[in-house]
A protein has these predicted regions:
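Interface amphipathic segments
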Residues: 1-402
Length: 402
């Protein structure tokens, strides 16, 4: 719970036939100060007067006071200052403008697995509310993480109580230049380390409130990370995407690991603000997927993805040009005279909310696939067909020979 320590509060209200004069002040100590003023020439009545002017100001208001209205995982600290001033008009209409500034702001996002903290060098919102629209602009600058700017025009008529006009026109423009420095590492501790990258976004929304249409571009560059569980470093990650109305088109994607790389492209179609259909392709040559003491592997995938997220069809092949399996445990090894054949090997795991997928992918071993274990030093060859109806119930059929 958030406590509020009011050091001093004063108020004055004088409403007679000559008009209304009201004034209120509150000193919250270290939590800031609030001042409010309202004047009107109208005589006394129930409710707000039809005419008048008002001004509300806040100075160094503790941003933590607003945490109760945020989600449990989100918290804000810093000092908020701002003003709101305007006129009262007949029929509960308004003509007002103002701004809000955040200084020394720190935004924290915390859940059971991660805690992310971002410091804001500058955060300013300016707005004007008159006639049939609420418009304004946002300027956000994050320490070490880039900038975001937005201009908006929303169909919210300037009257009380406020309500959105669903048939009214919407205009929104967003520009962002963000730098990722360790945020992914904080969100996925242990899984991702030394994450980095740059994101450039330019987007716009038009249409009506009930039927908005978006378009823009997204670029990711200079990105990379270390994946300790796989023992690899992914670098030179780039991506370009365009989004328009109900479609997101990834025109290019590329990532480097070890001696090779992967690249891809695809299209995501949206319905009811969710992904409805996927079409994508991923290919590569000698991409380092694992580099651990017990296992090293390069992969050359050629895969296609098509369908709805809950009925995704995966087809293609993965060539393993380099594979080295090292054995560290001493155990009895039985070697057949000619080869070892694996047929119908089940990869089923414990079922827990299975993710449906229609998979048929052939995995082919290249010329440099070896096993070096206690009592075994041999080359592997062969291929298997991996099929699945869900990601937790895969099956491989074929043969791998020593």
């Amino acid at each position: 719970s958030q406590s509020l320590d009011v050091k001093e509060a004063t108020g004055k209200l004088d409403w007679n036939e000559s008009g209304l004069a009201a004034l209120a002040r509150a000193d919250l100590g270290t939590a800031g100060r609030v001042d409010a003023r309202l004047n009107s020439p109208d005589p006394p009545r129930f409710g707000l007067p039809d005419r008048g002017d008002f001004r509300l100001s806040a100075d160094r208001l503790d941003a933590a006071l607003f945490n109760p209205i945020l989600t449990d995982a989100l918290s804000l600290t810093g000092s908020l200052s701002g003003t709101a001033a305007g006129k009262l008009l007949p029929r509960s209409q308004l003509d007002a403008a103002g701004e809000v500034r955040l200084s020394g702001g720190v935004l924290s996002l915390k859940d059971e697995k991660a805690h992310v903290t971002v410091q804001a060098e500058k955060a300013q919102l300016r707005w004007a509310w008159r006639d049939k629209t609420l418009n304004g602009d946002l300027d956000l600058r994050l320490a070490q993480h880039g900038t975001l700017a937005a201009d908006f025009r929303l169909p919210v008529p300037a009257r009380l109580p406020a309500a959105v006009d669903g048939a009214g026109l919407v205009q929104l423009a967003v520009r962002a230049e963000m730098r990722e420095k360790g945020l992914l590492s904080a969100v996925f501790p242990g899984l991702v380390q030394e994450s980095r990258g740059r994101l450039d976004l330019s987007g716009a929304v038009s249409g009506t409130w009930d039927n908005p249409k978006g378009n823009g571009t997204l670029k990711v560059g200079q990105a990379g990370a270390t994946l300790p569980a796989m023992g690899i470093q992914v670098s030179d990650v780039t991506m370009e995407a365009r989004f328009e109305d109900r479609e997101i088109r990834v025109t290019s994607f590329r990532a480097v690991s070890g001696p090779g790389s992967i690249e891809g492209s695809g299209t995501l179609r949206l319905r009811d603000r969710e992904i409805h259909h996927i079409e994508a392709r991923l290919s590569g040559e000698r991409f380092q997927t694992v580099r651990l003491p017990e296992l090293e592997m390069l992969a050359s995938p050629d895969l296609t993805f098509e369908g709805a997220p809950k009925a995704l069809k995966v087809r293609g092949s993965i060539v393993i040009p380099d594979l080295l399996i090292r054995g560290g445990e001493k155990r009895a090894v039985v070697r057949p005279s000619k080869d070892v054949v694996i047929v119908g090997e089940s990869l089923e795991k414990e079922k827990n909310r299975p993710i449906p997928v229609d998979m048929e992918v052939r995995v082919v071993l290249g010329d440099r696939a070896f096993v070096k274990a206690e009592g075994v030093d041999a080359r592997l060859e062969g291929d298997v067909l991996v099929t699945a109806s869900s990601l937790d119930a895969m099956k491989a059929t074929g043969e791998i020979r020593l």
